[in-house]
UniProtKB/Swiss-Prot annotation:
It is an enzyme of class 2 (transferase). The gene is lipB. This is Octanoyltransferase. It comes from Coxiella burnetii (strain CbuK_Q154). One of its GO terms (molecular function) is lipoyl(octanoyl) transferase activity. Pathway: Protein modification; protein lipoylation via endogenous pathway; protein N(6)-(lipoyl)lysine from octanoyl-[acyl-carrier-protein]: step 1/2.
């Protein structure tokens, strides 16, 4: 069993600084760094993945469009959508990228089935679907065995912006959300359902759960830790030279 830290960000988070925070965490982490899962909701934004094509953005309007470094095509993020950013060491977990994606899909589908929603993955396209409607999108990046980015689960949101794009590069793909099947639905209830399943399916111990009001935790926890390690290395190097 491995340790994991779960961070729940309390406010709507703009995409750009969150993306930069993920990159920083991944670049600085070491083999002993504890895995983290970040739960949050974004301010409205379209994100274009590495495989994204301009023709799949039909009309972004006043919603910003950001080209990012995750896999996949264009999608929408906004209030009422649960983002789970998975900052994991796949080598330590013994997971290939393919198995990682399948485990995410199966875990999300299992959580939705607990709400009576007949969700499942598809062999031909990443994500989780209810019939032919997509309820959860997955976009990842893996560097040196460390994953970042994650999944977007539609809970209780305005789905209208999806009509301004070809979601995930599929013309005419319909989107759905938990609220269409379970109404009312609360975001915290969805988290309480999905967290234990992620812990079980990925082999994690009970997590440390932290509520964050901003991205300052990255500076407080990780950059300081990295600086301390760098200082220790410099001290050792200097002592050897002396």
């Amino acid at each position: 069993m491995n340790d994991v830290i779960i961070r729940q960000l309390a406010h709507l988070i703009p995409y750009q600084p969150l993306w930069e925070a993920m990159q920083t965490f991944t670049a600085l982490r070491q083999s002993q760094t504890t895995d983290e899962i970040w739960f949050l909701e974004h301010e409205p934004v379209f994100t274009q993945g590495l495989a994204g094509k301009p023709e799949h953005v039909l009309n972004s309007g006043n919603i910003p469009l950001i080209r990012t470094d995750r896999g996949g095509q264009v999608t929408y993020h906004g209030p009422g959508q649960l983002m789970m950013y998975l900052l994991l060491d796949l080598n330590r977990l013994g997971l290939s990228t393919r198995t990682f994606v399948r485990t995410i899909e199966n875990t999300v589908a299992e959580s939705l089935q607990e709400w009576g929603i007949p969700a499942q993955g598809k062999e031909t396209a990443p994500g989780v679907y209810v019939d032919d409607k997509k309820i959860c999108s997955i976009g990842l990046r893996v560097r040196k065995g460390f994953s970042y980015h994650g999944l977007a689960l539609n809970v209780a949101m305005d789905l209208t912006p999806f009509s301004c794009i070809n979601p995930c590069g599929f013309k005419g793909l319909m989107m759905t959300q938990i609220q269409d099947y379970v109404n009312p639905i609360e975001m915290d209830a969805v988290k309480r359902t999905i967290i234990p399943l992620f812990l079980k399916n990925f082999g994690y111990n009970q997590p440390a759960i932290m509520v964050e009001t901003s991205l300052e935790f990255l500076i407080d926890d990780h950059l300081r830790s990295f600086s301390e390690k760098l200082g220790e290395r410099e001290t050792v190097t200097n002592s050897r030279q002396n």
